[in-house]
Amino acid sequence: MPRAVLDTNVLVSALITPAGASARLLVELRAGAFELVVSPALLAELREVLHRERFRRYVSIEDADAYVEVIIRDAEVMEDPPATSGPIAGDPDDQFLVDLARVSRVDALVSGDARVLDLRDRLPVQSPAEFLASLED
């Protein structure tokens, strides 16, 4: 079974855009099509982003917290990995995702962030639509 790290932007998109590829990935996750790998840092970032004022029109604080708990229930929660020998992410704030993907040896780091997608030559990075298509093959 494939294993994947979903970037925070994918998890947020899945919640606020229920008809998109990111939301369909969560349906596939619940159907057992792949294993989701998360870490405390990823979960903390997800919670922090969903608590931002600009997301109030999409989700309440209570519903955001419930969503994070569902993600925890449906995922393998790994310890935050140590930093790698050198950053390779274009954005230092994304380095923890790269480190998690490397240490957990996932089949894909799934992101909608162009800077993360630019790492394709060094990591198995896919967009939500690409990863969804790979599950359907």
What does each of the following model-derived ranges do?
Residues 10-11, 42, 115-116:
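Alpha-helix capping/helix-boundary segments
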Residues 15-16, 50, 120-123:
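Short, flexible helix/strand-to-coil boundary loops that buttress conserved ligand/catalytic motifs
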Residues 25, 97-98:
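Short, hydrophobic alpha-helical packing/hinge segments within bilobed ligand-binding/sensory domains
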Residues 28-84:
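PIN-domain endoribonuclease scaffold, especially VapC-family toxins
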